[in-house]
């Protein structure tokens, strides 16, 4: 009985989530580079909206999560309830050097990985897997996803990340 009440309370509270009433951000690709010899890629992009201050409370205040996600394999369902099978993903971070500008510059240190066990774990994709996966693509779609307590999820418009730039970094030789 207690579980039923908790379930009903969760449903009631989730239906009360406010619409953020914010326009969808337009993201523009700037660059991508591999971080040292790690399987981590720094993706830089510009937004016409400050993604980390959507609610006017200050940078990062009131936000539960700020994620940047790119679909690597044609799965374009970016919804919170869905795990994209193969993706580039990471936390949205502000470029401190660009503070107080009319547009905002952000970066994400992204892992290129595959989701396993219904979202319970992830595995980094190998260089060979990434080359095969991206071989016939010109761009891949990416979105910012912001969640905040009491609000519906916020999604940006799609940004197209050039695959040629990503493959250049994936295939960079590593230091001996």
Where are these regions (language model features)?
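Positively charged n-region of N-terminal signal peptides that target proteins for export
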Residues: 1-4
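C-terminal motif of bacterial Sec signal peptides marking the signal peptidase cleavage site
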Residues: 12-15
């Amino acid at each position: 009985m207690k579980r039923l009440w908790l379930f009903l309370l969760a449903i009631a509270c989730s239906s009360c989530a406010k619409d953020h009433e914010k326009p969808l951000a337009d993201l523009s690709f700037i660059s991508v580079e591999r971080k040292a010899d790690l399987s981590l890629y720094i993706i830089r992009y510009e937004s016409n909206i400050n993604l980390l201050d959507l609610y006017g409370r200050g940078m990062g205040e009131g936000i539960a999560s700020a994620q940047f996600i790119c679909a690597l394999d044609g799965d374009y369902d970016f919804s919170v309830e869905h795990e994209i099978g193969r993706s580039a993903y990471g936390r949205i971070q502000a470029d401190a050097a660009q503070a107080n500008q009319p547009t905002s510059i952000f970066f994400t240190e992204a892992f290129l990985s595959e989701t396993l066990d219904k979202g319970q774990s992830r595995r980094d994709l190998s260089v060979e897997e990434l080359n095969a996966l991206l071989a016939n693509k010109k761009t891949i779609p990416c979105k910012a996803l912001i969640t905040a307590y009491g609000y519906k999820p916020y999604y940006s418009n799609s940004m197209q990340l050039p695959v040629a730039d990503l493959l250049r970094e994936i295939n960079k030789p590593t230091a001996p």
